[in-house]
Amino acid sequence: MSIDYYIKHFVDNFIIRCGTILGICSQVIFDYRITIRFEAFTCAFITGRMKKRFKCFGKSKICRSVDFVNPQYISIGDGTLIQNHCIIEAWVFSKSYKGEIIIGNNCAIGEYTHITAANRITIGNNLQTGRFVLITDNSHGKTDGSDLDEAPSKREIISKGEVCIGNNVWIADKVSIMSGVKIGNGVIIAANSVVTHDLPSYCLAAGTPAKVIRYFK
């Protein structure tokens, strides 16, 4: 990666960290009502400084301590909230793997959610996630175990395919959604599930690996 990439990444994170420091100071110094207003100001400050760096950015909000990698390959619609401590990465490793992330309108990305793309991740409208959710279209290393003698950081990045999440989906805490998965509209995924296969619309899924346990329509 070029020196320009590292400079831009440093500047992006510096802006976000400044907003984070402002938010933390408000919690220490002021009472609850003032803190809420200060949090809103912090989000507005971070969003205002960051939004021009994205491929497309609607009328949405970024909270403090959010880490973006290559936001020029990330699109976010209107009315979406990226909550504290999220990591959203669009990796560019080669011509074969050039990550892109598209997040729709009116989504709420819960705290500590990690979205990482080396291929493409598409999220529809009105997504709600809990905390500590992982959405990934890639992994380190081959599934046949032929590269286990290499350090994980040096193994080839592999993607089984794009991740596509439909509209009005609810993803509970600590769910992992793996590469090559398509999730339909109106799906509910129970906490701690690992999604490795497609899920049809209007169902409740749970487990490791996640299975449909109820259909709503």
Annotated model-derived regions:
Residues 1-137, 162-168, 175, 185, ...:
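Domain-scale signature associated with acetyltransferase and cell-envelope carbohydrate enzymes
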Residues 141-151:
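Short, flexible, mixed-charge acidic loops at enzyme active sites
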Residues 151-163:
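A short acidic, glycine-rich active-site loop
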Residues 179-180:
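A short, flexible loop at the N-terminus of ABC-type nucleotide-binding domains that lies
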Residues 184, 188-190, 194:
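A generic "structured core" feature
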Residues 197:
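Active-site nucleotide-sugar/metal-binding loop of Leloir-type enzymes
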